[in-house]
Amino acid sequence: MSDELLTSVLTPNMLKGLTYRETALRVFSVLLSDFTKTELAEGIERAYADNFASVAVTPVTRVGDEFLLELHHGPTSAFKDVALCMLPQLMSAALKDTGRRVMIATATSGDTGKAALSGFMNVPGIGITVFYPHGKVSDIQYLQMATQEGRNVAVAAVEGNFDDVQSTVKKIFASDLRQELADEGVQLSSANSINIGRLVPQVVYYFDAYRQLVEANEVEQGAKVDFCVPTGNFGDVLAGYYAYRMGLPVRHFIVASNANNVLTDFLTTGVYDRNRPFVKTITPSMDILISSNLERMLYYASEGDTALIARLMENLRNEGVFRVEGEMLERIRSLFKCGWADDAETSAMIREAWRKDGRLVDPHTAVALKVARERADRSVPCVVLSTASPFKFCRDVYIALTGRPLEGDPDGFAYMDALSGLTGENAPAPLAGLRSMPVLHKDVVRPEGMADFIRAAAARAF
C-alpha cells in the first residue's frame, strides 16, 4: 500500500451524514484507485445491500461505559464477512474480460474460512481452498466449513496448529506450484489478510464507527477515541492503523490477546518471541504465535526502513525472535497499548457482560472488553470490536454463564439450544440452519500434503 495514500487524506467531517455504503465508497476510492467509481459502487451494493442483518451493517451500541462495534451481522456471523463479501466483487471486477482464472488458498483459525467460502461460492473464474487446524476450531465453526456447498470450493483440516497451516500456505505461494498453475492460466491468490484487498474493506468500519459516535453525540467531531481490538494475527488492528494514518482521530489502539500473548509481550518489552508453548484456548481465532500482519505496521514505525524489517523477519524465521528498540519502539508504544486475558478471565467477563450489562458476547469480544475495562486512562471513549456471534462459541459461552457443561457434554447444537433457552436470545438463522445440512468435506491432510490438495482442487474447479 502506497505511503502517500496513508497521509491524512480523509477526515471524519468529510463523512458526516453518510451511510455505511457511502463511507465505503469514499474509503475505497482513495485506497483502490485502480478501480473505477462505478465498479466500486456496484461492488459495494452487491456486498452490503442485502447480506447483513443490520441496516447499519456494523452498528455501534453501548455496553456499560464502553461501546461495541458489532461486526457479526453478516452471513457467517463473524467480522470477516465485512471484507469477504467485498473481496469477491473486487476480484471479479479485476478479472472481467481478461480470461484469467484465480485459485485462492486460505488458512483459517476459524472465521476467515467460512466467510471466504461463502463469499466466493460459485463465483465464475475463481476456485477456493480453505485449510483449518484439525480439532482446533469450535463445533459450529467446523460445521460452517464442512457443510459448505459450491462447485468451486474445497476444504481440508490440517494436522497441527494455525501457525503450521498459515506458514505452509505462505510457503506454497513461493513454491513451484505457483508457477505450475500459472502455466495453466491460473493465478494463485489468497483470501487471508496477506491480500491487501482483504484489509481495505475493514478500514471502513473504523471510520463508520467514529461517524456513528459523533452523530449520537457521544464524541465531539475531531476528538480522539480508543479502539480495543481482539487479535492474534494483527490484521484487524492493522486496518484500524491504516484508518488512523488516513486521518481518523485515534488516541490508542489497544491490542487484546489471549494466553498466546506474544503481542502483549512485544508491545511491553519490544521483544517478539514465538518460542513458547502454544496454548489451546476458548478463543481459537486468536490462538496464533506468528502475527503475520505485524510486519506491515513495523514498516511504517521504522519510517520505511525495508532493510531493517527484512532483518527482523529473517530473525523471526530463523530464530523465532526479534527485538525492536529505541525511538522505533517508543513510536509504537505511544499509539499501541495492550493487555490479555486467560480463559478464566474471559469466562468471567462473559458473565459480567450478561449479568451486569445484559449483553451476550462471544469469548473473543470478552477478551477485548476485559482489556478495555482495565485501561489506566479512561478519559476518552473506547470502542470494543465485537468480532463474532456468541452462538459460534455456544459451548464455551454456556459454560461461562452456568459454570458447568451440559450432562454428557453433547454437540454444539445442544449447547446452542441451551444457550438460547438460558438467555432468551436466538441464534442467527445461518448458524441454526447448520443442523440440517450434510457434511460434505471430510479431508484431513498433513502440512506437506496441502500443495497436492490445492492442485487437485484447481483441477476440479477449472
Please annotate each region the language model reported.
Residues 2-462:
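PLP-dependent amino-acid enzyme catalytic core
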